[in-house]
Amino acid sequence: IIIANSVDAAGICHAIRLLNPKIKLGTSEWAATERLAEIGGKWVEGITVAQFFDRDSRAPAYLNFRAAYQSRFSREPGFPETFSFDATNVILDAIESQTQNPGQSLKEIVLARQQFNGVQRPITFDRNGDTLGKTFMVRIENGAFAPIRK
């Protein structure tokens, strides 16, 4: 398991594959951007990632976000773009709620409310501020992330 960003993970995969091309590799969601496949090329083929991002989401809010993102940036949004959009909306909702709850911190508002609308699914925070959600297993195949089907 490689815990690194996409650039470092690609380099580590390259070094490992030179030593043992058949070794099974996994990486953290942090590395699971489209840049990993782009930079890593053949060295990252077959790498497995567990992530909360659903590349095949059919949620209407996600499809709208995806279309708007593609129109503006001429490329698909990945997990950083999607989760940044969701995080921004959580904070904006909390700021709006703060006007009705003066004296409460944004953290207190988020933890008290617990659930917010995300573009792929509801965002639920536990009492520690961690999000709860379904995990999607993907693997890089032919230079792209592909879901691992059971």
Question: PLM features: what roles do these ranges have?
Answer:
Residues I1-K150:
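Extracytosolic ligand-binding ectodomains
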